[in-house]
A protein has these predicted regions:
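Conserved S-adenosyl-L-methionine
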Residues: 101-205, 210-214, 219-226, 237-238, ...
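Short, flexible coil/turn micro-motifs enriched in small/turn-prone residues
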Residues: 94, 98, 127-129, 153, ...
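A short alpha-helix capping/helix-coil boundary motif
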Residues: 91, 145-152, 250-253, 358-359
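Signature of N6-adenine DNA methyltransferases within the class I
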Residues: 161, 192-201, 208-375
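Non-catalytic, mostly N-terminal accessory regions of nucleic-acid modification and defense proteins
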Residues: 1-119, 181-194, 287-290, 308, ...
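Generic recognition of stable, solvent-exposed alpha-helical segments in well-folded globular domains
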Residues: 80, 84, 110, 135, ...
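Conserved, well-folded catalytic cores of nucleic-acid-processing
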Residues: 64, 68, 88, 92, ...
Length: 435
């Protein structure tokens, strides 16, 4: 639990908002909070007293935040409101950044929610070794709360390479009241694993796509490469094996990868993928719609790998893989960004649960979902692209004879031509009146 001393509480800051020292007062509050909460040491910003910051605007911002009515209702307690505000600004910054690393610290909420809803982390140890700003942990805690559980039922472990992003994650979780072990510092998960002995019940992650400069010579014979040494020019299958290495004997991982990982044979990736399938680790693959991410148009898929496919609490799924093609779902919310609705997410997660659970009532849906055997995957040379397996979408039967349809459509087309000529005449007439 985080403790805020009296001199750092919001009322104290608001009472001093009009004083010339407001910048120093905010910085002092940050110092006090860090002193009382060692897990936040070195994380909070202390630059509000700097010369270039307009103190009048800072005072107005303090008053504006102070005017928000934080009421401890069941649905909107203070940490929920502040957490959502923080998440909103993370999303806004991610959307406005440019360059190849733009928005890399932020996974869109609908993607995170899909992963969490499919995994259902009710309790246990949750790990994200490339945690960005901590969105996977926030959504996991919200999932537990939404299902009537206690957030303390999950233990959160994370790691982040970029120092600034690591600090964002620490602040994000602190605002939400979520205690987490993100290590004492930022660090590279491959060369400096901060949780080497952790075996998690759930791994939830969105690793950076197709990283080419990840390799270090000391990783050559790393014990994590059980299924093959990843190519030095692409970290995708290094991440996959890192996730599997950190799973408990009954653990499950859900993560995002670029679609190339489903079919690539570069640098031995095909052999690694084959061994993962043959080891019966791959549980489900979901092709996601395009344009879900701020920072890349690269199409992505969700992978679910599990060491728990022998019926412990779920249906025995040995020798099976579920493929879901969700590329047609979602709605464009801006010219270049798509989001999945709650209904879309429920459809994807519900399909997975129906297949995975006892008496789930699962049936294949042509064009959307199909349960496939390892033998069939072998025939496709261990390519895991869902479109190869789910088939085509069923269409409603059309009883109109082809010849009759051609006549009808031709007549409709000629009618449209005639209407076009009439409209052209009206436009020319009105334009003539303007000259």
């Amino acid at each position: 639990m985080f403790w805020v001393p009296a001199e750092a509480r919001w009322q104290h800051i608001q009472d001093r908002a009009k004083l010339p020292s407001i910048g120093q007062d905010v910085d002092a509050a940050m110092d006090l909070i860090e002193k009382e909460n060692p897990s936040l040491r070195g994380v909070l910003p202390r630059n509000y007293a700097r010369e270039g910051l307009d103190k009048t605007r800072l005072a107005k911002l303090v008053d504006l935040i102070g005017s928000i009515g934080f009421t401890e209702t069941d649905d909107h307690c203070a940490d929920d409101v502040l957490g959502r505000v923080y998440e909103y600004f993370l999303g806004q910054f991610a959307g406005k950044e440019t360059g190849k690393d733009a928005g890399a610290f932020y996974t869109p909420r609908s993607v995170v929610k899909t992963l969490v809803e499919m995994l259902e982390p009710y309790e246990g140890r949750v790990l994200d070794p490339c945690c960005g700003s901590g969105g996977m942990f926030v959504q996991s805690a919200e999932f537990v709360k939404a299902h009537g559980g206690n957030r303390s039922a999950i233990s959160v472990y994370g790691q982040e390479f970029t120092d600034t992003t690591w600090k964002l994650a620490k602040m994000n979780l602190a605002l939400r009241g979520i205690e987490a072990n993100l290590g004492e510092r930022s660090a590279d998960s491959f060369t400096d694993d901060l949780h080497p002995d952790l075996r998690a019940d759930y791994v939830i992650a969105n690793p950076p796509f197709n990283v080419s400069d990840w390799h270090n010579p000391k990783l050559a014979d790393d014990p994590r490469w059980t299924y093959g040494t990843p190519p030095q020019g692409n970290a995708n299958f290094a991440w996959v094996q890192h996730f599997i290495y950190h799973l408990s004997p009954r653990g499950t991982a859900g993560f995002v990868l670029a679609n190339g990982s489903l079919s690539s044979k570069t640098g031995g990736e095909g052999e690694i993928r084959e061994r993962l399938v043959q080891a019966d680790l791959v549980d489900c693959i979901v092709s996601m719609p395009p344009n879900l991410f701020f920072n890349t148009p690269i199409p992505v898929s969700l992978w679910f790998v599990s060491k728990d496919r022998h019926g412990n609490g779920h249906r025995k799924r040995v020798g099976e893989v579920l493929f879901i093609d969700a590329r047609k779902l979602g709605t464009m919310v801006t010219r270049r960004l798509r989001e999945l609705s709650d209904e879309d997410i429920a459809r994807i997660a519900g399909t997975y649960h129906a297949w995975r659970n006892h008496d789930g009532g699962y049936v294949d849906v042509p064009g959307f979902a199909r349960a496939t055997t390892l033998e069939e995957i072998k025939k496709h040379d261990f390519v895991l692209t869902p479109g190869r397996y789910v088939g085509t979408e069923e269409v409603e039967a059309d009883d109109e004879p082809v010849a009759d349809k051609i006549v009808r459509l031709t007549e409709e087309l000629y009618a449209e031509f005639e209407r076009g000529r009439e409209l052209e005449g009206v436009v020319r007439e009105r334009l003539g009146g303007l000259i």
